[in-house]
């Protein structure tokens, strides 16, 4: 296997574009993965802008396993570790293989989330390529062992809402960046123009892309939450979102429209991969019975995605037990201290002079519980 690969790249030079021998590298990768599991899928994206997405994406039954990034022969791989491109890939998946065809470097992250070289090997030098090739059997065994570790990498399980929100937030940020990057594309500009026409004429493109990226991610989450045992994709996401989230259902239609832009497609697939493979039961248990998971998770997500935005918009979820206590106290106070409300909140149903105002309505939690309390009082009567 190794001798055949080296023979196919004998004319490799630092001057040649990294794409020149990409097909031979892809053949090697396919043979390596077949050593372990033929169900592993290697997706190659040759026509891409520099740094927009990895050269190869490895997945298993839709779950993202890791990335492989191919560089020009002779490039110093260790010098790339602090580049924006590599930091981006590691933030999305801390399982990355760098190669210049002859050297292979397996990279992850340390306890401080900094790039960490886990293992590296060299299978030949450029000088050796120009001579009769006799690779050592041990070199091939070492290469197989390196990729065995890479392919068998298991990400830390996500078992609570906070970790899940932290996992989704960088993908959403990069989705926002991609929307800004491709704002001249008709698929993006037409949505922006609709937002300006029907929602807010003074909307900036950055605010638009931020809001759209959040909404698209959240629409995928809502779809999975509503159908935890169904695989969510761009074809069924709209119908999977609860009907009472009508606006988000409508926004989900934009997902298919944006899917035609490769970098956005890749990021949407990353989000879908995460959502379809998370333990939704653990997320629901973490959110517990005192919280509406459909609404509460947005606060958790926004605190990970952009805590300053969360604070400026006042996105805070009050636990249901606290809301009930406040509503019951208000009901009692009306009965004992206000002659126009002898029946408490129920009196508001018959007296138009009694008004309920919520100055920071947010999830409408207080308002909903107030109406429910009024209705129960009526039923009891």
Named regions from a protein language model:
Residues 1-4, 190, 292-300, 321, ...:
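Generic alpha-helical secondary structure signal
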Residues 1-45:
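Charged, often low-complexity linker/regulatory segments
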Residues 9-13, 203, 309:
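Short amphipathic alpha-helical interaction patches enriched in hydrophobic/aromatic residues
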Residues 17, 21, 213-217, 290, ...:
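Hydrophobic (often cysteine-bearing) scaffold residues that line and stabilize catalytic clefts
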Residues 31, 35, 194, 198, ...:
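Solvent-exposed, charged/polar functional surfaces in cytosolic regulatory/catalytic domains
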Residues 48-54, 58-267, 316, 322-381:
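Charged, often flexible domain-edge or linker segments that flank or initiate folded functional domains
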Residues 248-311:
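Non-catalytic substrate-recognition/targeting regions of SAM-dependent transferases
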Residues 300-328:
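Class I SAM-dependent transferase core
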């Amino acid at each position: 296997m190794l001798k055949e690969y080296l023979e196919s790249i004998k004319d490799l030079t630092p001057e040649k574009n990294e794409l020149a021998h990409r097909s031979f590298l892809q053949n090697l990768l396919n043979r390596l993965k077949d050593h372990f599991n033929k169900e592993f899928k290697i997706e190659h994206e040759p026509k891409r802008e520099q740094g927009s997405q990895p050269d190869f994406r490895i997945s298993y039954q839709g779950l993202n396993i890791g990335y492989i990034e191919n560089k020009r022969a002779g490039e110093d791989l260790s010098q790339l570790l602090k580049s924006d491109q590599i930091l981006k890939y590691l933030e999305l998946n801390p399982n990355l293989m760098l190669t210049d065809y002859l050297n292979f470097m397996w990279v992850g992250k340390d306890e401080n989330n900094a790039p960490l070289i886990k293992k590296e090997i060299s299978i030949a030098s450029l000088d050796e390529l120009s001579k009769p090739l006799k690779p050592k059997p041990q070199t091939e065994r070492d290469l197989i062992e390196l990729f065995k570790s890479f392919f068998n990498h298991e990400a830390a399980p996500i078992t609570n809402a906070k970790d899940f929100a932290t996992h989704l937030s960088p993908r959403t940020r990069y989705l926002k960046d991609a929307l800004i990057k491709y704002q001249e594309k008709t698929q993006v500009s037409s949505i922006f123009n609709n937002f300006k026409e029907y929602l807010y004429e003074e909307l900036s493109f950055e605010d638009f892309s931020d809001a759209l990226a959040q909404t698209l991610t959240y629409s995928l989450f809502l779809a999975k939450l509503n159908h935890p045992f169904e695989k969510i994709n761009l074809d069924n996401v709209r119908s999977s979102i609860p009907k009472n989230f009508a606006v988000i259902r409508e926004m989900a239609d934009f997902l298919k429209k944006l899917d035609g832009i490769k970098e956005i497609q890749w990021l949407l697939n990353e989000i879908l991969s995460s959502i379809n493979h998370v333990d939704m039961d653990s997320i629901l248990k973490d959110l517990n019975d005192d919280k509406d998971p459909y609404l509460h998770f947005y606060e958790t997500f926004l605190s990970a995605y952009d805590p300053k935005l969360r604070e400026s918009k006042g996105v805070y979820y009050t636990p249901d037990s606290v809301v009930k206590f406040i509503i019951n106290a208000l009901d009692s106070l009306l009965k004992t201290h206000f002659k126009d409300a002898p029946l408490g909140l129920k009196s508001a149903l018959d007296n138009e002079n009694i008004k309920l105002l919520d100055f920071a309505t947010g999830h409408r939690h207080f308002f909903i519980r107030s109406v429910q309390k009024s209705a129960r009082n009526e039923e009891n009567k």
